[in-house]
Swiss-Prot record:
Keywords: FAD, Flavoprotein, Glycoprotein, Oxidoreductase, Signal. Its cofactor is FAD. Transmembrane segments: none annotated. FAD-linked oxidoreductase; part of the gene cluster that mediates the biosynthesis of asperfuranone, a probable antitumor agent. The polyketide synthase afoG is responsible for producing the 3,5-dimethyloctadienone moiety from acetyl-CoA, three malonyl-CoA, and two S-adenosyl methionines (SAM). The 3,5-dimethyloctadienone moiety is then loaded onto the SAT domain of afoE and extended with four malonyl-CoA and one SAM, which leads to the formation of 2,4-dihydroxy-6-(5,7-dimethyl-2-oxo-trans-3-trans-5-nonadienyl)-3-methylbenzaldehyde (compound 2) after reductive release and aldol condensation. This is FAD-linked oxidoreductase afoF. The keyword Oxidoreductase applies. The modification Pros-8alpha-FAD histidine is found at H92. Residues 52-227 form the FAD-binding PCMH-type domain. Disruption phenotype: Completely abolishes the production of asperfuranone. Induction: Expression is regulated by the asperfuranone cluster transcription factor afoA. It is an enzyme of class 1 (oxidoreductase). One of its GO terms (molecular function) is FAD binding.
Length: 481
């Protein structure tokens, strides 16, 4: 391994207004590492793909390291030469702040290993592994983990988890960060270290909810669980027209205190332009035998759906079908707020506001999602084990603005903020304490909303310790002072 001083000495002359990336990095990384400037014929093959066209970073080049040693050298050289960079995997992160980022893309796609250890009951995944990469190996092993499963198969495992890690199996297994037992992480000095309960435990605390701010995680190890229901699930999709909206919202409020752990529910508000009507879709994922699903089916049927589809599937089939966010080319921004209670009247206001917006802007394709997972197991984990603060959230609202014309950005941003304020006002949480799940953040909420006022002093201290120059975590930055 080459040492930092050697790298600095040899590349110091490369500092200039225009940096030749091949000259800067090429001599110090393995031959398999790919380097491309913007405009090179192979740039699109080296840079990480992005899901959304909204506020993307401006890349000055891209590099795809082959080994951890390559990645260490890249970080050392970039920091020494004031080359801004951002490590990427699935390319699904969005934030208002990303549009201000200019720098080098470090594509982690080559770190896509998935290693199951039945003896220790853990699985280790590389930085480039996608959720689709882990589903079948876990299924064949009869195991499961809660690492934000419920996201699409093209989403990066680690990125989707280190902000909290919610998904359809949250009721059964709790948060993804609570199953995170160890990481290998490259810090701002280029050092590769381990963080677990016995080594750098404070850093592990910070990674469990704010991991993107402290380095590049090359591998993460998670505790596994026995697969629920022998790897099978019952899934039901029920679609309702606008006349049923309030009844559907009232049904959702019934689940506030009686949601069983094996049940995951997502309600979405969207618009069907073939019939020019706002529709509600209730997706139910039931990780238990068919017989125990019947009550939920009967409730959904009693609300009068215009269509329904119910089937038995394997977990592999279930998660392979969640491929919506794998489609690229549109402008997509996201925003969120956590809810401690379901207020049907407020949800009806959201429905009405979105209907008016759909009718005013024919090019708008967005949707609002309300995600319900039992939080009993989430609450069982002591709060002091992770910086993730919002364990009392009962329902996660995720609003996705989707449009093809960039001129719609301003009105869609206003819609998102307006809906967020309405929902927070009746969320059951204090007015000055919005519960923002950082993985869904719009980008304007601020660190107190992402990690809580109580956690910020310790979190800022650790940021100063591990990343004093703020080279990591550009999308949701931690204040250092």
């Amino acid at each position: 391994m080459r040492f930092l001083l050697q790298s600095i000495t040899l590349v110091a002359a490369a500092r200039a207004a225009s940096i030749d990336l091949e000259s800067l990095f090429g001599p110090y990384v393995s031959p398999e590492t790919e380097i491309a400037e913007v405009g090179d014929a192979d740039f699109d093959e080296v840079v990480s793909p992005r899901w959304s066209e909204w506020r993307p970073p401006t890349w000055t080049g891209a590099i795809k390291p082959q080994t951890e040693e390559d990645l260490q050298e890249i970080v050392r050289i970039a920091v020494a030469n004031n080359v801004s960079f951002m490590a990427t995997s699935g390319g699904h992160g969005t934030s208002l702040i990303y549009g201000t980022v200019k720098g080098l893309d470090i594509n982690l796609a080559n770190f896509n290993n998935v290693d199951i250890d039945l003896e220790s009951n853990t699985v280790t995944v590389g930085a480039g592994a996608k959720l689709g990469d882990i589903t079948e190996p876990l299924y064949k092993a009869g195991k499961a983990i809660q690492t934000a499963r419920g996201n699409s198969p093209c989403v990066g495992v680690i990125g989707a988890t280190i902000g909290g890690g919610i998904g359809y199996e949250t009721g059964l297994f709790g948060l993804g960060v609570d199953a995170l037992v160890s990481v290998r992480i490259i810090t701002a000095t280029g050092e590769l270290i381990t963080a677990n309960e016995t080594c750098n435990s404070d850093l592990l605390w910070a990674i469990r909810g704010a991991g993107a701010n402290f380095g590049i995680i090359t591998a993460a190890t998670f505790k596994m669980f026995d697969q629920p229901n022998n790897g099978d699930a019952v899934i039901g999709t029920f679609v309702y027209n606008s006349s049923k909206s309030l009844g559907v919202f009232e049904y959702l409020s019934v689940l506030d205190n009686v949601l069983p752990p094996e049940l995951g529910v997502q309600l979405s508000i969207g618009y069907d332009r073939t019939i020019n009507e706002t529709l509600l879709t209730v997706d139910i994922k039931h990780f238990a035998p068919w017989a125990t699903f019947v009550d939920h089916w009967e409730h959904a049927e009693a609300l009068g759906p215009i269509s329904r589809n119910v089937s038995n599937v394997t977990l592999v089939e279930l998660y392979a079908g969640l491929d919506g966010p794998c489609q690229t080319g549109a402008y997509v921004s996201g925003g969120t707020v956590g809810l401690g209670r379901t207020d049907a009247a407020t949800m009806q206001e959201v429905f009405d506001d979105m209907t008016a917006f759909y009718e005013q802007y024919p090019g708008y394709l967005g949707q609002s999602l309300f995600q319900r997972y039992a939080n009993n197991n989430t609450l069982k984990t002591p709060a002091h084990t992770a910086v993730y603060p919002w364990r009392d959230t009962k329902m996660f609202w995720l609003h996705e603005n989707i449009f093809l014309n960039p001129e719609l950005e301003a009105p869609t941003n206003e819609l998102l903020v307006s809906l967020r304020e309405k929902l927070h006002a009746t969320s059951g949480f204090p007015a000055d304490q919005p519960h923002i799940y950082v993985n869904y953040a719009f980008g304007d909420e601020g660190p107190e909303a992402w990690w809580s006022k109580e956690n910020l002093p310790k979190l800022s201290y650790l940021k100063r310790k591990w990343d004093p120059k703020g080279v990591f975590g550009k999308g949701t930055p931690i204040p250092r002072f």
